């Protein structure tokens, strides 16, 4: 109880910082590789099950336009690789393996490949998301990210006067299926890097259709992230994160309690 009160007080003490435009011009392109490892513990029909899921996601990004404190960022996933382990069985996959295209078990993961998604970002928050392929793609990405993906993270757009150690601000983002409340604190500033610690409380409600089965997930928890930005350009260089989510997963009408542990690591490379 005491910990909850302290965390709530920290969020209340923080404030929203007015953002500025990214320092880099429209047309800037970069690649992001994100590795994530999820361990899910669940109990269903009297049986305890542990599922280990590791993913490596390759994405291309482009800063499409900049207007004041608002900018548009487009992205597409070019490759997915990883492994799934459950009940003594392990399966590895790589979207570059041509044989996977005929595997119905991978249909949900592969449908996100090479589909452009456009994000409009204002004051450090995504205010609009659009995809020509519709909401199914966006729902799939939401489920796979477990609330750890923040598309507003790639550019640090604070006023120059705010770039100093201990400066903090908060962002509340309530969207259908995902509600997050994040506290940002600048941990260190050097001539080359700006280190930012992020504490995010997330609540995820999503529905995923996999192999003809409807899977509903209701989870909430906390994610801790460390981001390193280039001090000159304000572009993200790397991110690491750990966290946990708890809740229920509904499969075939049956609720099962789940406990999800998440670790992530991202690296950004200019193109």
Predicted region positions:
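Bacterial Sec-dependent N-terminal signal peptides
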Residues: 1-25
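Signature of exported/secreted
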Residues: 20-271
């Amino acid at each position: 109880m005491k910990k909850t009160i302290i965390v709530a007080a920290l969020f209340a003490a923080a404030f929203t910082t007015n953002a500025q435009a990214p320092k880099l011009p429209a047309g800037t392109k970069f690649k992001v590789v994100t590795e994530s490892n999820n361990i899910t513990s669940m109990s269903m029909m009297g049986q305890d099950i542990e599922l280990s899921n590791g993913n490596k996601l390759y994405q291309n990004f482009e800063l499409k336009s900049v207007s004041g404190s608002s900018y548009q960022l487009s992205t597409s996933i070019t490759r997915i690789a990883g492994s799934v382990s459950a009940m003594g069985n392990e399966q590895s996959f790589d979207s570059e393996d041509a044989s996977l295209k005929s595997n119905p078990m991978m249909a949900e993961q592969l449908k996100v490949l090479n589909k452009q998604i456009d994000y409009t970002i204002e004051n450090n928050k995504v205010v609009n998301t659009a995809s020509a392929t519709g909401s199914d793609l966006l729902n799939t990405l939401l489920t796979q990210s477990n609330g750890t993906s923040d598309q507003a993270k790639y550019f640090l757009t604070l006023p120059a006067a705010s770039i100093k150690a201990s400066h903090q601000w908060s962002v509340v983002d309530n969207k259908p299926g995902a509600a997050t409340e994040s506290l940002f604190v600048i941990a260190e500033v050097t001539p080359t890097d700006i280190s930012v610690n992020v504490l995010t409380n997330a609540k995820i409600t999503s529905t995923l259709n996999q192999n003809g089965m409807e899977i509903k997930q209701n989870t909430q928890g906390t994610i801790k992230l460390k981001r390193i930005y280039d001090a000159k350009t304000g572009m993200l260089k790397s991110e690491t994160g750990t966290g946990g989510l708890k809740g229920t997963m509904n499969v075939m009408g049956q609720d099962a309690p789940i406990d999800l542990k998440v670790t992530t690591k991202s690296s950004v490379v200019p193109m």
